[in-house]
Amino acid sequence: MSRNVDKANSVLVRFQEQQAESAGGYKDYSRYQRPRNVSKVKSIKEANEWKRQVSKEIKQKSTRIYDPSLNEMQIAELNDELNNLFKEWKRWQWHIDHTLMEKKTKRKRLEDSHVLMNSGKLINGKRYFGRALELPEVKEWLKQSQRQNDGGSINTKCIPKDRNDFYYHGKVTAALTEFEANWTSILKAHYNVPVNEDEEEMSRQTQEIHVPTLADMEHWLVQRRKKKLMDELNL
């Protein structure tokens, strides 16, 4: 009995909707199946209504995907549905902007901004929404991407010990400075490169400077103390 009542009510509702649509143009788009081919819709008003239905469904499912009671399979299925809905929404948007709308406008509807804000994260050519970012394949892909990024940096631990010195890293040492000072003028003369007078003078002065050794410093300190002691004794 109840099934017959429900069937009669549904028939009555459909009849009333048809009358309302024919009389005043009212149509409950949520009760109809969306067209698969968006190009068949020639009315911009109808296209906007279908796009609004897609936006509502995206909003509902993007909220549901955060449900902690969902298992991994349900999350993956829901994420695939959201990917398909997002593609459908883009088809409607393109059809409206490039086919039906005579003059393009920058004004965005409220549901459009919601869809764009909740468009998920694009990973390896696919969008992932909400808890779908916690799926094993997503974590594995992010780990591989991180390893590839880390591989581009220099790891000094992999450098051989005999190469891990000042010369390998390009640090300036006294020996390197002396070598450059001695050979700069020679190499420039060999390759016919004009030598700057300031550089030549600096190179000559560098060659003339005697860098004291540790033994020289010890000898100098002994002589200084000896002279100071002799001055105190008036010798």
UniProtKB/Swiss-Prot annotation:
Disulfide bonds: none annotated. It is found in: Cytoplasm; Nucleus. One of its GO terms (biological process) is mRNA splicing, via spliceosome. It comes from the Eukaryota. The keyword Nucleus applies. One of its GO terms (cellular component) is post-spliceosomal complex. The keyword Nucleus applies. Keywords: Cytoplasm, mRNA processing, mRNA splicing, Nucleus, Spliceosome. InterPro entries: Helix_hairpin_bin_sf (IPR029012), Isy1 (IPR009360), Isy1_sf (IPR037200). Pfam families: Isy1. Belongs to the NTC complex (or PRP19-associated complex), composed of at least CEF1, CLF1, ISY1, NTC20, SNT309, SYF1, SYF2, and PRP19. Involved in pre-mRNA splicing and cell cycle control. As a component of the NTC complex (or PRP19-associated complex), associates to the spliceosome to mediate conformational rearrangement or to stabilize the structure of the spliceosome after U4 snRNA dissociation, which leads to spliceosome maturation. The cell cycle arrest of SYF2 defective cells may be due to the inefficient splicing of TUB1. Also involved in DNA repair. Present with 1990 molecules/cell in log phase SD medium. Belongs to the ISY1 family. This is Pre-mRNA-splicing factor ISY1. It comes from Saccharomyces cerevisiae (strain ATCC 204508 / S288c). The lineage of its organism: Eukaryota, Fungi, Dikarya, Ascomycota, Saccharomycotina. The gene is ISY1.
